[in-house]
Swiss-Prot record:
Homodimer. Probably interacts with PlsY. It is found in: Cytoplasm. This is Phosphate acyltransferase. InterPro entries: FA_synthesis (IPR003664), Phospholipid_synth_PlsX-like (IPR012281). It is an enzyme of class 2 (transferase). It catalyses: a fatty acyl-[ACP] + phosphate = an acyl phosphate + holo-[ACP].
Amino acid sequence: MRKIAIDAMGGENAPEEIVEAVLKAKPELPEDKFIFFGDEGKMKELLPADDDQIEIVATTEVILDEDEPVKAMRTKKDSSMVVAANWVKEGKADALLSLGNTGALLTCGIFIVGRIKGVARPGLMPTMPVESSDDGFNIIDVGANATSKPEYLLQWAEMASYYAEKVRGVSKPRVALLNNGAEFDKGDDLHKEVYQLLQDSSLNFTGNIEGHELLQGKADVVVTDGFTGNAVLKSIEGTGSVIIHMLKDGLLNNGVKAKLGALLAKDALKSVASRFDKDKYGGAVLLGLNSPVVKQHGRSDARAVYYAVKQIDKILTEDLTNTFKQEFSK
């Protein structure tokens, strides 16, 4: 039975939404066992007793969003996140899911779970929506690394392409390099060198992609340095929130005609909202570690966490980590 470590105390809605999500997913995943790390009293109130698929590991500390990541990992040794990461490191669990402090989770992933031998740097990779289909696209790295080298981006592209194929079911994923122009000679020295590395690789490399093209579905995998990727991710998320707020305000606070228009456009608006629902893709994966580590947004509700649990099950089923170990440790 595969074992998924759940940081039950991470995020704004912990532990209730996390428990609800796992209990919803559990009947669909009979081969998985869920190990909850956190406040034992709260866990026992929320979880069924005598369930072979559920285990509780009591912890006494929580890493907060405002905690400094490295210091938190070193000083809060009995926190739900750190204890869960150690269980994964020791082989007592096969994967880790957390909604907690992103920096702390990255730190625990890199320094406790550890990176795969041969992988220069792990990369953080979410799946984002596109306008043309429900398939979405992967973008890596979105903030695990402040600085990057060409070989990092090549490895991220290789791992992300394999993920897109095996977990998302994309045949021959199209890989693109985020750049400031479509031409091959665009960008700084880093991007020019990465372009050549991708061109010479066995990946289905389609060239550069510009920022305004990201949501158009022109690539299945977009590779970028962590600094740029983090800025792009936050820009997309922020713009989406602003647009939704403006639509709601415009339709509901501008008189009877606007409200009537909202009623008439209800189905179309629902369709658009469904297309750009990124929760259905699960969380962001820290690719390149000895075991899967997935970060779901701290504000996630039970529905979003449910999809992250299903995502981890798929990653374990496809045995991605061992494939990466065989490939990069040569």
